[in-house]
C-alpha cells in the first residue's frame, strides 16, 4: 500500500503507507532519546507540512508555498537568499 503526497503542481512523492518525513523524524528522536521540542526542521514544499507541524520548531523558507508558511512557527528568507543560514541565526543556533 502506498501514500501519495503532492508537493508541487507537477510533482508527487510516493511513500510506503504510513511513511512521511515526520515519521522518519519521530523514529530518529525515539532511537536517540531526543526531546521533540529540541528538533528543528526547514521546509518549503507541501510535502514538508506534516514535518514542520510535528517538530518543536518548524521553519518555512521565504519561497515556501503559502500553506507551508501557515503551519510554520516562523518564516525565514528564501532558499536563494541563504534562508537556512538566516534561519539558524534567527534561532540563535549559530553565531
Curated annotation (Swiss-Prot):
Sites binding phosphate sit at 21, 47
Annotated family: Belongs to the HAD-like hydrolase superfamily. Cof family.
> Which residues are Mg(2+)-binding?
44
Keywords recorded for this protein, A-Z: Magnesium, Metal-binding
InterPro entries in the cross-refs: HAD-like_sf (IPR036412), HAD_sf (IPR023214)
Q: Which Pfam families match?
A: Hydrolase_3
Q: Which GO terms describe its molecular function?
A: magnesium ion binding; phosphatase activity
- Name this polypeptide is given: Uncharacterized protein in pdhA 5'region
Q: Which PANTHER family match?
A: PHOSPHATASE YKRA-RELATED, PHOSPHOSERINE PHOSPHATASE
Which cofactor(s) are needed, names only? Mg(2+)
Taken from the UniProt entry, a GO cellular component term is: cytosol
Highest classification ranks of the organism: Bacteria, Bacillati, Bacillota, Bacilli, Bacillales
Amino acid at each position: 500500500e502506498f501514500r501519495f503526497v503532492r508537493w508541487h503542481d507537477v510533482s508527487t512523492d510516493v511513500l510506503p503507507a504510513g511513511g512521511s518525513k515526520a515519521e522518519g523524524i519521530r523514529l530518529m528522536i525515539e532511537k536517540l532519546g531526543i526531546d521533540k521540542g529540541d528538533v528543528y526542521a526547514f521546509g518549503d514544499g507541501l510535502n514538508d507540512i506534516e514535518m514542520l507541524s510535528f517538530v518543536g520548531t518548524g521553519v518555512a523558507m521565504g519561497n515556501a508555498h503559502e500553506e507551508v508558511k501557515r503551519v510554520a512557527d516562523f518564516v525565514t528568507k528564501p532558499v536563494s537568499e541563504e534562508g537556512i543560514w538566516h534561519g539558524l541565526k534567527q534561532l540563535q543556533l549559530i553565531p
